Each structure stands twice: as structure tokens, then as C-alpha cells.
Amino acid sequence: MNLHEYQAKQIFAQYGLPVSEGCACQSLEEAIQAVKKLGGGQWVAKCQVHAGGRGKAGGVKLVKSEEEVRSFFEKFLGQRLVTFQTDAKGQPVNAIYMEACANVKKELYLGAVLDRSSQRIVFMVSTEGGVNIEEVAEKTPHLLHKMPIDPLVGAMPYQGRELAFKLGLQGKQIQQFAQIFCQLGKMFVEKDLSLLEINPLVILDNDQLHCLDAKIVVDGNALYRQPELNAMRDPSQEDAREAAAEQWHLNYVALEGNIGCMVNGAGLAMGTMDIVKLHGGQPANFLDVGGGTTKERVAEAFKIILSDQSVKAILVNIFGGIVRCDLIAEGIVAAVNEVGVSVPVVVRLEGNNAPLGREILAQSGLNIIAATSLTDAAVQVVNAAEGK
């Protein structure tokens, strides 16, 4: 689960990390009051969306008067911001963070991620702050320094000092960086994070380190024990179909194709998407209904797929092991009757109670295309999506 920048900075402040004073504003009136409270002659206005690349998209701007604040709010508040990390629709801007301006001498990068291969939290630093860190890793990997954390002892000051040396920090900056590093390590564990990022971590004109940006991603599997963070969830930033699928314990990821896919098992779902693409089709989604599904969940899965207006055909690929094919068939029939499907539906059933499942579909009187194999299913659904 992603947090907004202003929410992440609230967490940073709880751990004593240096962040700028600011206010998340949901109206122009709140923004005018915020800049008066912050004081100074200039501020930074930041659109709050769950996506990077805000600056390049115009969603972060230095404003020097109340009139410029007004202009920024009229342009972005209530609109959708499109960045290189969003789809063509962009993300809704429901709040704009007004922040005190900082005098920056140098920009650095500091981040941490849960590395599943090494089963450790890994910190990363670079002297190339304020830019896309993926580009740094690809083009100049020698400028990206990593530090794995022993889970038994956590982030240690000596590790922070070692990274500080690699960043070229001097004097009191080294001690300050070590403190920031240790607090971030503590935060990562206590808050069940999967990623945190400060890009940029800056050196101010007074030579102090400062967290100019803040990004936090919380492990969704741990939200049950993080009520404070769970309360910060912003459903408006999530795909409505993915949110609906989560309520029914369905694994759904929206894509940009026109062939809806409903499969049981993540591996089979990925294989199904591959074979659809192999035959010239474009999947509209990844959807794994799971091994212990019910006909009600199948019906909801159908509704979620059909809520995507770009879907021109649907492929149902079920290998019955734990899940029975007759239950899937009953769910398909119920969903088609309830929703009223106007697009072709191709179904391939194999395994547990597959003959019974096929019989249920055949006797339903619905216009369902039966496939004899996975290859046949892929060919038929691609042709159906193309209107052949």
C-alpha cells in the first residue's frame, strides 16, 4: 500500500527525521491559510498522487505569491495528473501539499527495499539525487552503493558511517546521516514497510541533511497490525476494479489489452496471458480466482472483468484440482445471466469435474464457445476479440 508524501513525512517526523514544515490542503482556502502560517516569501506546491515523475509533469512547482498558489490550485486540484508512472488517465489530485521552501546545496539519494532473494532489507545511496534512480542503476551502477541489513541486529551506526563516506559527507554530516540511517532501519521494521525512498535527501545551505521528499510503501500483508497506516489508505488512488477484487480475495491486475482473462492459479494465469499474446492478442487483465474459489467469487470476477469497457472477449481457463469445474461453470452461468454479457466468452475446462462443468455450460443455452485445448482457446478468443 502506498502513502502520500505528506503522510510519509508525518511518519518520518515521528522518528525524528528532518522534514520541512508543510500542510496538505484540499481547498484553495486551506492553501492560503497554510502559506500564511508557513511564512516566508516562497513555497513549494506538490500534487499528492501515488506516482513518481510529478515534477516533470508539472505537479511540483515553486510558488512565490498567493496569486501563483491560486493559479496552481485552479490548474491541478480536482484534476488528474498524468506522469510516466501512471496510465493515460492519470491519478486524481485530491490534495496539494504546501511546504516551506528549503535552500539546497546538493541533492543525494537514500532508499531501502526488501530484497527477497537475500531475505534482507537493503539500503541504497547515491550522489545522484533528484533523478530517476532506475536510470542511475542502469547507466552508472558504480554510483549506486548498497548496504544489506542483518535482521538480527538491525541498521547499525557503523554501516551508516560507511555509506556517508561513500556519499562524500564530512564532519557532523556523517553523524547526522548515521542517525537518519538507523532511524529509517527501525522504521522499516516497526512499520512493516516494503520500500522507502528519500529522493532527494539534500544538504542545505547550513550543511545540515534534510529529507526533501518521502516515499513509503507498506507491506499489504501486514496492514492488519498497522491500523495507523491502514487508516491512511487512499482508495481514490487505486484502480476501482483492483479494489473490488481485493474485497473478494481475488488477485486482479488491470492491463491495457482487450481480452479479459479468468484463470485459477497464478502460474496458469501468467501462462494463459503468454499464449494469448503468442497468438496476437492483448490481455486486459491478470485475474487469479484462487484454488478454493466459490461460484459467488467467480460471478464477482466476471463482473469485474466486464466493468472494463475495453474488453472485447473473455477467456476462462480452469484446471480443476482443488477447485471443481462444475462450480466454475455455475458461477459463469450466474454471472452471464445477472450481468448480461455482450462479448464472446471462450471457456476451457480441464480436471476435477470438467465433463460436468462442460455439460452445465452446454445446457445453459448461453452463447459460450467451448475450447478443446489451451491453444484452441487462445486462437478462438483472439479471433473473437477481432470480430472474426
Curated annotation (Swiss-Prot):
UniProt: Mg(2+) binding residues: N199, D213
GO biological process entries: succinyl-CoA metabolic process; tricarboxylic acid cycle
GO annotations of cellular component type: cytosol; succinate-CoA ligase complex
Reactions the enzyme catalyzes: succinate + ATP + CoA = succinyl-CoA + ADP + phosphate; GTP + succinate + CoA = succinyl-CoA + GDP + phosphate
Binding site for substrate: N264, G321, I322, V323
Pfam families: ATP-grasp_2, Ligase_CoA
Keyword Nucleotide-binding found: yes
The protein's annotated pathway: Carbohydrate metabolism; tricarboxylic acid cycle; succinate from succinyl-CoA (ligase route): step 1/1
EC number: 6.2.1.5
Domain ATP-grasp: residue ranges: 9-244
GO molecular function: ATP binding; magnesium ion binding; succinate-CoA ligase (ADP-forming) activity; succinate-CoA ligase (GDP-forming) activity
Residues bound to ATP: K46, G53, R54, G55, E99, A102, E107
Cofactor binding remark: Binds 1 Mg(2+) ion per subunit.
Cofactor entry: Mg(2+)
Keyword terms, alphabetized: ATP-binding, Ligase, Magnesium, Metal-binding, Nucleotide-binding, Tricarboxylic acid cycle
NCBIfam families referenced in this protein's UniProt entry, alphabetically: PRK00696.1, sucCoAbeta
Known partners and oligomeric status: Heterotetramer of two alpha and two beta subunits.
Family, similarity comment: Belongs to the succinate/malate CoA ligase beta subunit family.
Physiological role: Succinyl-CoA synthetase functions in the citric acid cycle (TCA), coupling the hydrolysis of succinyl-CoA to the synthesis of either ATP or GTP and thus represents the only step of substrate-level phosphorylation in the TCA. The beta subunit provides nucleotide specificity of the enzyme and binds the substrate succinate, while the binding sites for coenzyme A and phosphate are found in the alpha subunit.
Protein name as annotated: Succinate--CoA ligase [ADP-forming] subunit beta
Natural source organism: Mannheimia succiniciproducens (strain KCTC 0769BP / MBEL55E)
